[in-house]
Design a protein with these regions (language model features):
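RNA pseudouridine synthases
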Residues: 1-185
């Protein structure tokens, strides 16, 4: 198995991965060119000064169109960690929801657990949605947008969705993703 860290180190031993995505989540990652910059970005993440937005396709739909979800999640050491996630339902087709998530904390599997709690697990999530009719699908969770200020300059990046994600959107008759309004904070 080759990891993102392995790929980055093959390009330059100075490069550092600043944060992580859950396995099988697609989308944006920040890679620093050196340890000094990695530490700066680490502090920005800890201070919640980097805004992350995810897009997910989920089986079912949440009861509310938009809300904050506060959850206690066990970490790998069985310690409870508090999480906060804002979500907005963007569209529903054939009982499949297109949901935008903004995690205000960054814990392992946070969005996947939140989705399950909302009653609409992410398509392709075999860990938290093992009885789905979509078990053979790739995980439909994408780190879609990153926004931050660095050296007094605003930065914003958008991810392209994978072919598989786009094909699924088309198959279930979702409109072009650019038509949906992103949550502003």
């Amino acid at each position: 198995n080759i990891s993102i860290d392995d790929i980055i180190k093959s390009i330059s031993s100075d490069y550092r991965l600043v944060h992580r995505l859950d396995k099988d989540t697609s989308g944006l990652l920040i890679v620093a060119k050196n340890l000094y910059t990695a530490k700066i970005f680490g502090k920005l993440f800890k201070s919640s000064l980097i805004q992350k937005t995810y897009i997910a396709l989920c089986e079912g739909q949440p009861k509310q169109k938009e809300s904050d979800v506060l959850l206690d999640i066990k970490n790998k050491k069985d310690k409870i960690e508090k999480t906060k996630t804002h979500y907005k339902l963007l569209a529903v087709q054939n009982n499949i929801s297109l949901i935008q998530y903004k995690p205000l904390t960054g814990k392992t599997h946070q969005l996947r657990i939140v989705s399950k709690k909302l009653g609409c697990s992410i398509i392709g999530d075999n860990k938290y949605n093992s009885h789905s009719k979509f078990n053979n699908e790739e995980l439909k969770l994408n780190a879609f947008n990153l926004k931050f200020i660095f050296k007094d300059k605003n930065y914003e990046f958008f991810s392209e969705l994978s072919k598989d994600f786009n094909d699924f959107l088309k198959k279930y008759k979702f409109k072009d993703l650019k038509r949906y309004t992103l949550v502003k904070f």
